[in-house]
Structure formats: structure tokens, C-alpha cells
UniProtKB/Swiss-Prot annotation:
Pfam families per the UniProt record, alphabetical: 7tm_1
Region described as Disordered: 321-347
GO MF: G protein-coupled receptor activity
Family membership: Belongs to the G-protein coupled receptor 1 family.
Protein name: G-protein coupled receptor homolog U12
Location(s), subcellular: Membrane
UniProt xrefs under SUPFAM superfamilies: Family A G protein-coupled receptor-like
Superkingdom classification of source: Viruses
Organism: Human herpesvirus 6A (strain Uganda-1102)
PROSITE patterns documented for this protein: G_PROTEIN_RECEP_F1_2
Biased composition (Basic and acidic residues): 322-341
Described purpose of this protein according to its UniProt entry: Probable G-protein coupled receptor.
One GO CC annotation: membrane
Length: 347
């Protein structure tokens, strides 16, 4: 969603040509390409993963993090649809009213906060499960309560962001924009940016890294061979998360620094828009990497899909297996009889 800053009608006055530079046009084309790729790949992957995990829980017991991972993918699914609506509106393919713009922007920030925070919570739960040294299956009631509290907290954090959203009334296009028209609103907007930089960037990275590093060290100290697959999974998980989050934190800090010292120049406007463009892409990259890392790494999803298939189609599998066994036994008998006939033939 584009940001329109108009401080007492002075900032950006007469700078309409700044938004049509070749650099910004190229950046917007690249953003559209990346968004299209993530939308077309992430949504089908998330549907496959969530469906498989839900069906698997009907035939097998769940572990401590199962429901949390399912809600993580569900929030990623909602987030990608919010990205879709925001993209088609930004390209002016559809016009929205102010309420729908605020609703989409609110849901986007709420589920994004929930998704990134859930990654850190899953890390803490795995750490607790490891150190209790016993089977720790979370009760449905406590799991639901924790998910509800996190969802409520994420929604409360997202409320201030929706207050800045309006439709671009100057051009009458129905395009959703973050509109700031006073110095107090600008200061509040900057404060909200700082809070979300901490919620989306610093805090999850610290919690995630701390608990997974300890988790990895504990498994390595027990025996590396026994937990070789788990160690590989945790290392891939940690590496992929840090490769996204560390540049993300750096870009968030740069954006806050630029917004803290606004300038009425095309160069300043171009830098801020490019930073905001990259920031918009980072949650999409998380939504793309989460199914790949959490589900498709290590073959766990394949095993669960096979278990679901065997559970829902047992008769077919049994008859197929029996047919294979009978064919194999018949083949062995034919081989033995042929060998005996050849043995009894005269030379």
C-alpha cells in the first residue's frame, strides 16, 4: 500500500514527477514479478500442507507444536490473500471503498504479526519439550487459549495501522493509500513504524535464534547420530529464518532513519519508496519459505501424506498388497515348476 505524506501541504508539493522515474518503474515491475511468483506458488503449497496436516491428525496423535504450525500456515494463507487484494488495488484493477481498505490493511498487519510471533513461539515450545525430557502433548484447551491470546494481541497491535488508511480522493481512483496530512499524524505514524519494527524484526529474531541455538546444542550433546535428521532440520530452519530476518531488520531501521529526517527531494522520496517496496515483499518471502522449510524438508510431509492415504483407503491398499503377494507367489511357483521340468528333460 502506497504512503502519501502531506505535511501542511509543504512536503512533496509539486513533486508528482518523482514517482515516474525509471528506477522506481523498474522497482515496481520487479515487485509485481516477485509478488506474482509468491502468490502462485505459496497458496497451493499452503493448501496442500494444511490439508495433509489436518487429515493426519484424524488418524494419528499430534505433538506439542502441531496445532501451532497449522495456525501458522493458516495465517500465511490469509496473509497471501491480503497481498493479492492490496496488489490488484495498487495496480488499479479494482477500486475499494475506505472501509474495505482499512479492513484489508488491518487483517494484513494482524496476521503478519501473528505469523512472525508464532515462529518464535514454536521455537520456545520445542525448547520446553526437549528440557522436560518427557512426552508433553499440549491440551487442546491450553493450546486454544494461547492461540487466542496471540491472535488478540496481534489484532490490538494492528488497530493503529488501519487509522491511517484512506482512499486516494484527490485522483478519485478508489486506490488505498496510507495518508498522513499533519505533523502529529506523521509522528504517530513513525512511532507505529518503530513498534512494528520491534514486533516483526528484533523480538522474533532474538527469541527464535536463542531457543533454536540451545535446542540444536542440546541435541548435539546427547548424540549427533541419533538426532541427525532433527539437527539438519533445525539448522535449515534457523538459517532460512536469519537469511530473511537480518536484511529485514536492517531495511526497517533504514526506513525509520529516513522517515525521521524527511526531505522535500525526489531522491529522498525514491529511497523511501524503494525501502517500503522491499519491506512489503519480506512477509511474502516468509510465506513462501515456511511451507518449504517446515513441511517439505526431511520428508515428513510425504510420510504424513502416505499415512493419511493408507488410513482413508485401507481396503484398496490391502487388496492391492494381496494381489501383489499372490502374483509374487504364483511367479515363484511357476519358476520352480519350470526348473523341475528342465531338470527332468533328457540331455
Amino acid at each position: 500500500m502506497d504512503t502519501v505524506i502531506e505535511l501542511s501541504k509543504l512536503l512533496f508539493k509539486g513533486n508528482a514527477s518523482c514517482t515516474s522515474t525509471p528506477t522506481l518503474k523498474t522497482a515496481r515491475i520487479m515487485e509485481s514479478a516477485v509478488t506474482g511468483i509468491t502468490l502462485t506458488t505459496s497458496i497451493p503449497m499452503i493448501i496442500i500442507v494444511v490439508t495433509t496436516m489436518i487429515l493426519y491428525h484424524r488418524v494419528a496423535k499430534h505433538n506439542a507444536t502441531s496445532f501451532y504450525v497449522i495456525t501458522l500456515f493458516a495465517s500465511d494463507f490469509v496473509l497471501m490473500w491480503c497481498v493479492f487484494f492490496m496488489t490488484v488495488n495498487r495496480k488499479q484493477l479494482f477500486s475499494f471503498n475506505r472501509f474495505f481498505c482499512q479492513l484489508v490493511y488491518f487483517i494484513y498487519h494482524a496476521v503478519c504479526s501473528y505469523s512472525i510471533s508464532m515462529l518464535a513461539i514454536i521455537a520456545t515450545i520445542r525448547y520446553k519439550t526437549l528440557h522436560r525430557r518427557k512426552k508433553t502433548e499440549s491440551k487442546t484447551s491450553s493450546t486454544g487459549r494461547n492461540i487466542g491470546i496471540l491472535l488478540l494481541a496481534s489484532s490490538m497491535c494492528a488497530i493503529p495501522t488501519a487509522l491511517f488508511v484512506k482512499t486516494n480522493g484527490m485522483k478519485k481512483t478508489g486506490k488505498c493509500v496510507v495518508y498522513i496530512s499533519s505533523k502529529k499524524a506523521y509522528e504517530l505514524f513513525l512511532a507505529v513504524k518503530i513498534v512494528f519494527s520491534f514486533i516483526w524484526g528484533v523480538l522474533p529474531t532474538m527469541v527464535f535464534s536463542f531457543f533454536y541455538v540451545i535446542f540444536c546444542k542440546a541435541l548435539h550433546d546427547v548424540t549427533e547420530k541419533k538426532y541427525k535428521k532433527t539437527l539438519f532440520f533445525i539448522r535449515i530452519l534457523l538459517l532460512s529464518f536469519l537469511l530473511i530476518q537480518i536484511p529485514y531488520i536492517a531495511i526497517l531501521i533504514c526506513e525509520i532513519a529516513f522517515l525521521y529526517m524527511p526531505q522535500n527531494t525526489c531522491f529522498w522520496l525514491a529511497r523511501v519508496e524503494i525501502l517500503q517496496l522491499i519491506i512489503r515483499l519480506m512477509p511474502q518471502v516468509h510465506c513462501f519459505s515456511n511451507p518449504l522449510v517446515y513441511a517439505f524438508t526431511g520428508g515428513e510431509l510425504r510420510n504424513r501424506f502416505t499415512a493419511c492415504f493408507q488410513s482413508f483407503f485401507p481396503k484398496t491398499l490391502c487388496s492391492t498388497q494381496k494381489r501383489k503377494d499372490s502374483d509374487a507367489s504364483e511367479h515363484d511357483q511357476n519358476s520352480k515348476s519350470k526348473a523341475s521340468v528342465e531338470k527332468n528333460q533328457p540331455l
